[in-house]
Amino acid sequence: MEKQYYEVDSNTGELVPTTDVVVVLHEGDQVRRKSQIEYCQRNLTARNDNGNFVWLLFKYGENLFPNISAANLTRLMYVATFCNKDGSIMGKTELRQKMNLNRTRWSEFWNEMTENKILYEQDGIVYVDSKFVVNGKIKTDCNYTRLFCEYIQQLYEGCSSANDHKQLSYIFKIIPYVNRRTNMVCLNPTEQDEHKVQTMRLGNFCDIIGYDKKHARRLANELLNIRINGELAIGFFVTNLDEKTWQLVVNPKLYFGGKYDLLFQKYRELFIKEAQEYKKLNETIQN
């Protein structure tokens, strides 16, 4: 006979049936539901999987750093991943070497960052303004997402030249339009119900990033060529041959603003499974 579990209704004080198992770890410990324990386990697994992160602060529906160039947006996201608890990045000379930019590109980058009061130098150390990037607890009321340091660094450092930085910027430009729970690119990024998310088509995406919709398929091909450890940075849901209608989802391994719940796990697995199939296909071709 299957066991029946009960919980106390907080409103009436009555015992009511529940499918959620209540677990007491040790006498005197806090009582935790099975679902709470499972959530904590998923949270820990996700943290171990994705690694360290910093918070990027922004406003949904508004362009991300509209006053800086596309290439410098990618460079800023890379720099942000080195943010320490006090907002420091590293020495200015060290940072330039780390970014692997020539003198002209470095000057353009630094001038844009300082003119827009994003980065500043103090005693030879570069700092990022806490209005934009935070390592630690967020104290302001704003929209935010996690930038996962290791994978954004791999993305940047994997570029064959600085000319690739503009292409990578498309991934970051859409942050204000990425749904917190699903990482789908959409028109209502704060929507919590997966089924009510109004997904954005590739044609709309082109408009936001300033890309000619006539060349939407070329953009799709460019994005599908961006991988991190074999995983796509951006995936597409395709229902017909008209590429302008394709829907986009960002790999949560790059950035993610929501909870590490079952929905997060679902979308992570989409990218993991695709990477496994991609690897098998390449092995078959090579053999």
Enumerate the predicted regions with their spans.
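Gram-positive cell-envelope targeting signals
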Residues: V79, Q247-L248
